[in-house]
């Protein structure tokens, strides 16, 4: 899409005990394929843990949803989702510009 996105990894909801499974090397093959596929489009900090990269690339996202809206509407959308019972709601990033076509992970 040729836009630059800042992704705030600490804001991404993660299912309980996932890190424990990743640490035990219980990782779906599709996840590693995902990570390999997106590697040219994603910039991670030099010290970013490999386990966190794997979690962000997880292929087990059945039901996962990402919505991109103008910043002006984020609070309203989050509040509306919460009132509708969508509890794992979080603003996890921002579209910065039409630059590199990259996702920059923080």
Language-model features: where?
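Glycine-/charge-enriched secondary-structure boundary and capping motifs
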Residues: 1-106
């Amino acid at each position: 899409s040729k836009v630059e996105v800042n992704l705030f990894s600490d804001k991404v909801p993660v299912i309980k005990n996932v890190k424990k499974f990743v640490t035990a090397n219980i990782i779906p093959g599709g996840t590693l394929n995902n990570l390999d596929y997106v590697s040219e489009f994603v910039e991670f900090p030099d010290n970013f843990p490999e386990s966190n990269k794997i979690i962000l690339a997880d292929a087990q996202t059945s039901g996962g949803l990402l919505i991109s809206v103008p910043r002006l509407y984020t609070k309203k959308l989050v509040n509306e989702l919460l009132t509708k019972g969508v509890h794992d709601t979080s603003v996890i990033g921002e579209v910065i510009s039409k630059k590199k076509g990259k996702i920059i992970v923080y």
